[in-house]
């Protein structure tokens, strides 16, 4: 940054801003290469990001991605689509957060505006009854993808907002 004339002396917010990174832990050889043991705690951390997440297609309870993330101490996210069940979420929580730590597991809903109200309420009710410490969040872009006439993937803003609104309505 100094080459651009930006330093902590003339831009103090550079040292004041907390920046956290997250990405999908899709390529396991990449993640493994960046995994280290913390010298103080002896715990394993994936140093490629602060929080790692797995997607709908890599969240199988016996999949390599779930196994890998169960072995690191980073906060973890897991995307859940309309085909998921409460039992799926409960099993994932047991494997990814066996100590039921606050802040460890983030379930990321990506069901789509037309499906969230049919599926999330029952999942939420059953999972909450287990007393699991889960952060619930939403990725309203993923479940609302459509193909435009030119073949590009896009989203209708009204559908994105509808899913967000439904997500909060269901939680309250």
Write out the residue ranges for each language-model feature.
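Active-site-facing alpha/beta catalytic cores
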Residues: 1-112, 155, 163-164
């Amino acid at each position: 940054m100094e080459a651009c004339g930006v330093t902590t002396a003339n831009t103090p917010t550079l040292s004041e801003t907390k920046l956290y990174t997250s990405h999908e832990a899709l390529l396991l050889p990449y993640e493994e290469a960046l995994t280290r043991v913390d010298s103080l705690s002896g715990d394993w951390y994936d140093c490629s990001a602060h929080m790692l997440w797995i997607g709908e297609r890599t969240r199988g309870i016996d999949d390599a991605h779930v196994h890998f993330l169960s072995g690191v101490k980073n906060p973890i996210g897991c995307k859940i689509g309309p085909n998921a069940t409460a039992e799926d979420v409960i099993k994932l929580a047991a494997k990814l957060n066996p100590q039921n730590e606050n802040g460890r597991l983030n379930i990321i809903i990506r069901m789509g505006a037309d499906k969230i109200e049919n599926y999330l309420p029952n999942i939420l009710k059953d999972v909450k009854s287990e007393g699991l410490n889960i952060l619930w969040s939403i990725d309203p872009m993923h479940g609302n993808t459509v193909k435009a006439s030119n073949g590009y993937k896009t989203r209708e803003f009204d559908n994105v907002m509808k899913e967000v609104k439904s997500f909060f309505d269901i939680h309250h």
